[in-house]
């Protein structure tokens, strides 16, 4: 029988990522005895993983506004999805909020579109998001051991 692994990927908006990961690992040690378990925490939001590859953004959105990325700190605790909205959405965050009337379902649709368009252009080795790198490294280690 092949070795099983559980890989959990989740957003982390407010917690210290290392403390949060350790809390999750402690719970896993107590409850999941025989399975390899990895927690990959997207620091702040999953959009941080998209912002980790600027070339993928430019390929998906050639008219993206680079000025919004100048001061972005990768995996920093900041308004990540809002920065992405200002970068790629026509009219930026304010236009998206106005058009969606701040309804999460409409904002969620925009986020899904960004993930689809940018995601297909991501180059795994070039993504500079530390939390994304951790995720990829964990996957690669498990694939290599097969």
PLM-predicted stretches and their roles:
Residues 1-7, 12-146:
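C-terminal accessory helical subdomains adjacent to catalytic cores in phosphodiester-
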